[in-house]
Each structure stands twice: as structure tokens, then as C-alpha cells.
UniProtKB/Swiss-Prot annotation:
The keyword Transmembrane applies. Pfam families: Glycos_transf_4 (PF00953). This is Phospho-N-acetylmuramoyl-pentapeptide-transferase. The gene is mraY. Belongs to the glycosyltransferase 4 family. MraY subfamily.
Length: 361
């Protein structure tokens, strides 16, 4: 909205031409989301505290988590609210990718909200039944894939690329493209949700990955940079840096309240939405495999659950003391802050490795 106003005012004052620069608007988007989060956060937390009982705690979980009982949840609504407002203010609302990512974020956020509401209303830590959750996620994931495939305006937008191997480019059929899009959106949505089990554990890797994806989006949308870096040129993808910056700002604002010991939990409303956004942006800028590297913490958490469940069903034995794997380290005696910070460190390293692929091609 403000971007459109600035474009109109540019005819009267050249200073407003600053708003044509994505880098300038991305900084404004990040700061707007950050300050909105810090401003709205205390009020929202007070409102969420009115839900009696707060976040239900798993009875089979680590005993130290029982002290978290009563902590308000659904704090992810703060992130979705501030990201949406920031993007509407500073984003180019004529860009279809901007609208797609916003719709995906709000759609998966709605699924998460319903899941959280069931947990609170029924005092059931399991929430919405898995089959219904996956059905709803699948509908939106497939819809996003179909939209991206049939609105693609360049061959690069529907081609699969292997990082560091510029000569490998695999054209995708409609079925394979939609399948990959579905898997990345739904997969990362649930991966971030599985990671969100400790105070601040999921949000910092999300912020880091969002910042890195913003770099890829900016480069992909710029013909000069994408040609130099030998990454696919996707017209219009550059505007996604606004969303990535808004997520970074909102995420840091949320972390202010979610840092150990947390005043509020993200809930599925935030985790499912943010994971879906990361997956969607990675698909748009054709960096699916790079996301697997940069989001390695989310991938490891998910694999630990898959390994645990598979092992127990086949052999009756558990590989980990508890899954997801962050609980395994808790039960080994690691204090919660140590687990969190070490996972953050791993995430920083993996994001740097992902960014390094920009030059290693």
C-alpha cells in the first residue's frame, strides 16, 4: 500500500524513487514487522493467557516440561499478523508470487489455528487428527503447485536444478512439478512443526533460512545477478525478499517473548505456516535442494521421528530416548538452553553452506 503510494508520489518528488529499490523496502519490511511484534506482543500474550490451562503438555514428555504447563500458546498468530501487515505495506501487490506466498501462509496458519484450538478446548495435546490435518495441507499444497506450474512464464520456473552442477537441469512435467511442490510445502510445514518443541528452537533457524532465501530470491529476480551466479532467472521472484525480510523481523520480535523461559509458545498456527512459506519460496526460486541443506535442523528433527517410528514398528526398539531428537538430548541431561543454542549454531553453519552454493557452481 505504501509502496503504491510512493510510486504515485514519485512524479512530484524524486526522493520517493527510493521505494523502487527492493533492498530499501526489505529493510523497511523487517523493521516494520519487528516493531509491530514488540508493540502488539504484550497485548496479544495477555489475551492468549485468558485461555485457561494454556498449552497442554505431553504426559510422556520430559519431566522438566511440566513446569511449562499454563504457558499461553498460539503466539504464531503474532508472526502471521505482523508479516501480513508488513508485506501489504511494502510489497508489490501486483506480484503474483507475493500473493501466493501470503495465501499459503494464511491457509496453513488456519490449519494450525484449528489444531491449536482443539488442543486448548479439549485439553488434548494431539489436537486435530493427523488424517484431517494432512488432507487440508495436501489440498493447499497441491493447489499451490498447480498455480505455479500453469502460471510459469519461463522454462526455468519449471526446471529442477542440482546445486553446484550448473549443467544439470531437469525439465519437469506437470505431475512431477506439482509432486515436488507438494512434498516441499507440506514436508517443511510439518518439519518446522516438529522442531517447535523447545523455547525459541524453531524460530531462529526459520529466521536464518528466511534471510538466506531472501538472498536467493533477490538474485533470481535480477537478470544480471542470476546470470553472474549461474542460478535460474525467475522474473518477479525478487519481490519475495520483502516477505523473507518481514519473516525475519517478525521472527526476531516473536523471539523476544519466546526466548527461554518462554512467555508464549508459537503453536501450530505459526509453525505450520512458516514451514509452508519456506517450502513455497524455495520452489519458486528453484532452490529446493538448497533448502534441504539450509533447513537441515528441520530435516534432522523429521528424520529422527521417522527413524524412531520405523524402528519401533519393525523391531520393537527405539533408536532415541525420545523423538524428535531435541528431546533425546534433554533426556541425556542437556539443559534446554544448551540444546537450543547448539541447534542454532548448527543452523547458522548449514545456512552458510547453502549460501556458499551461490558461488560453487
Amino acid at each position: 500500500m505504501l509502496f503504491e503510494l510512493a510510486r504515485w508520489l514519485q512524479q512530484f518528488e524524486s526522493l520517493f524513487g527510493l521505494f523502487n529499490y527492493l533492498t530499501f523496502r526489505s529493510i523497511l519490511a523487517a523493521l516494520t514487522a519487528l516493531f509491530l511484534s514488540l508493540w502488539i506482543g504484550p497485548v496479544l500474550i495477555q489475551k492468549l493467557s485468558q485461555f485457561k490451562g494454556g498449552q497442554p503438555i505431553r504426559q510422556d514428555g520430559p519431566k522438566m516440561h511440566f513446569s511449562k504447563a499454563g504457558t499461553p500458546t498460539m503466539g504464531g498468530s503474532l508472526i502471521l499478523m505482523t508479516v501480513t501487515l508488513s508485506v501489504l505495506l511494502w510489497g508489490d501487490l501486483r506480484n503474483r508470487y507475493v500473493w501466493l506466498v501470503l495465501v499459503v501462509m494464511l491457509a496453513f496458519g488456519a490449519i494450525g489455528w484449528y489444531d491449536d484450538w482443539i488442543k486448548l478446548a479439549r485439553r488434548d495435546p494431539n489436537g486435530l487428527k493427523s488424517r484431517w490435518k494432512y488432507l487440508l495441507q495436501s489440498i493447499f499444497g497441491l493447489a499451490a503447485g498447480l498455480f505455479l506450474y500453469f502460471t510459469a512464464d519461463v522454462p526455468a520456473a519449471v526446471t529442477f536444478y542440482i546445486p553446484m552442477f550448473k549443467s544439470i537441469a531437469l525439465p519437469l512435467t506437470s505431475i512431477s512439478f506439482v509432486a515436488i511442490t507438494y512434498f516441499w510445502i507440506v514436508g517443511f510445514s510439518n518439519a518446522v512443526n516438529l522442531t517447535d518443541g523447545l523455547d525459541g528452537l524453531a524460530i531462529m533457524p526459520t529466521v536464518l533460512v528466511a534471510c538466506a532465501l531472501g538472498v536467493f530470491a533477490y538474485a533470481s529476480g535480477n537478470t544480471l545477478f542470476s546470470s553472474y551466479l549461474k542460478i535460474p532467472t525467475i522474473p518477479g521472484a525478487g519481490d519475495l525478499i520483502i516477505i523473507c525480510a518481514a519473516i525475519a523481523g517478525a521472527g526476531l520480535g516473536f523471539l523476544w517473548f519466546n526466548a527461554y523461559p518462554a512467555m508464549v509458545f508459537m503453536g501450530d498456527i505459526g509453525a505450520l505456516a512458516l514451514g509452508a512459506v519456506l517450502g513455497t519460496i524455495a520452489v519458486i526460486v528453484r532452490q529446493e535442494l538448497v533448502l534441504v541443506v539450509m533447513g537441515g535442523v528441520f530435516v534432522i528433527e523429521t528424520l529422527s521421528v521417522i527413524i524412531q517410528v520405523t524402528s519401533f514398528k519393525l523391531t520393537g526398539k527405539r533408536v532415541f530416548r525420545m523423538a524428535p531428537i531435541h528431546h533425546h538430548f534433554e533426556l541425556k541431561g542437556w539443559p534446554e538452553p544448551r540444546v537450543i543454542v547448539r541447534f542454532w549454531i548448527i543452523s547458522v553453519v548449514l545456512v552458510l553452506v547453502g549460501l556458499a552454493t551461490l558461488k560453487v557452481r
